Design a protein with these regions (language model features):
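A short, solvent-exposed beta-edge/loop patch
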Residues: 109-181
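Short, solvent-exposed recognition patches
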Residues: 28-128
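Bacterial N-terminal signal peptides that target proteins for export
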Residues: 1-9
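Classic N-terminal secretory signal peptides
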Residues: 10-14
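C-terminal motif of bacterial Sec signal peptides marking the signal peptidase cleavage site
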Residues: 17-20
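Short, conserved catalytic or interaction motifs in soluble domains
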Residues: 23
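Residue-level marker of positions within ordered structural domains that often coincide
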Residues: 1, 26, 63, 166
């Protein structure tokens, strides 16, 4: 009888081992909730609004991270600093019916065009364009000047958007020595 008990023991561990699987589709684990809540409180936003993205050649500009008009906001800049795109997260929904009715950033007097692209919406108005990604009651917007950042960069940013892990959360926080990374 001891032999079947030994065979059964590893099966008992299986749920424990699988608990951490797929915690973050980008390979890390979600940031500790207490750390995320403290950071969000410091920025003046709700923790569920904090998202990050990853695009080769771009890094987050730490001084830009925080609250902007009740949204979470962060600016990503190119390694050379010549181009930027913004990541904005707010509560709400974006549907085929509402897409063109919602203004695109500061552009309110120009018609917004919408194109469904995978799980996101590609939106354009004047010289601004963005990818808007609905995700469980929030909308993540990746916005840039269409003349400076091409659509492919914004699409990559939209595809990579996710909740931060501990390392990514630390990268959002301003360093204490006054130097950003």
């Amino acid at each position: 009888m001891i032999r079947p008990a030994r065979a059964f023991f590893p099966l008992l561990l299986l749920p424990v081992l699988l608990t951490g699987c797929d915690a973050d589709k980008n390979g890390g684990t979600a940031a500790d909730s207490a750390d995320l809540e403290a950071a969000a409180r410091g920025w003046g936003v709700a923790p569920e609004l904090v998202y990050v993205t990853k695009v080769s050649g771009y890094t987050v500009f730490q001084q830009s991270v925080g609250e902007y008009e009740d949204e979470f906001a962060a600016v990503y800049r190119s390694e050379k600093g010549a181009t930027t795109f913004g990541l904005f997260v707010s509560r709400g929904k974006l549907t085929a019916e509402s897409c063109s009715k919602q203004p695109l950033g500061e552009v309110s007097d120009t018609a917004v065009t919408c194109e469904h692209d995978g799980d996101a919406w590609y939106r354009k108005a004047g010289h601004s364009h963005e990818y808007a990604v609905p995700d469980g009651g929030v909308v993540i917007r990746l916005t840039a000047d269409a003349d400076k950042v091409d659509r492919a960069i914004l699409r990559k940013a939209a595809e990579a958007v996710h909740r931060p892990d501990d390392t990514e959360l630390a990268a959002l926080l301003r360093t204490t020595d006054g130097v950003d990374t």
